[in-house]
């Protein structure tokens, strides 16, 4: 499933679909304070749903939305924060690549993980939008409204929204809808999504050999990176387990006589700190297997624990001193 989801995301990115969506939503939301920030967050949410790749979302929106926001007079710090936070939604909103990897490591159902992640992901997106609108309402200078002469007629705005939003929404429903309805497995839905991305590219007349070739190359490159991380991390985890590391950790946590909530707080602090210097792949494959036996010991719902980790990693990717999303934006 991972290579197919990656291919779908890269093809959607190369096809220019996201650019059309951003500018259409920006026009539709022109009456709201911080309309471009709202458009950027909605686009990040939809693009995350279509790809599940943090780096791709932040990088593309950095090239697409950030220059437009700065040119419109937006505060640079405000614009950067909007793009970084919106881009990190890809770690949580299905079909998140991270959740697929987590399901393999923890032997959990990817369907149930996706179902559990939808509400937190959309809730965070809604909170980000609420923050952006409120902040711009309180301090209009950080997000000036667009000039009235730049706004086209309503009929033209409606046409742009329909042309850009409906096809992408159909692709999202093809992927997520079939998974959540139990019609297809994640791998089958990913294959359907990849084929749907090809159809969308043809529909928008951007299905060029160069775009297709770049998407295949980036898919192979990213998949190879993830697989090598898997190999190294699984090797470490196997040796760690063979030498009794899991038993040492379990004995330590059980001997200090802590409650379930204290265990959750300790583990989330550890995950948060690890999110500064490490990518999510290393954290999941090396450290999560250490915590999984303890999750069962303390009687924590494994899907609840997975959501805590996903939310935590998203937060840590926004937090200095590392702030990986900021590095993606700067690059």
Where in the sequence are the language-model features?
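Alpha-helical transmembrane segments of multi-pass membrane transport proteins
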Residues: 1-331
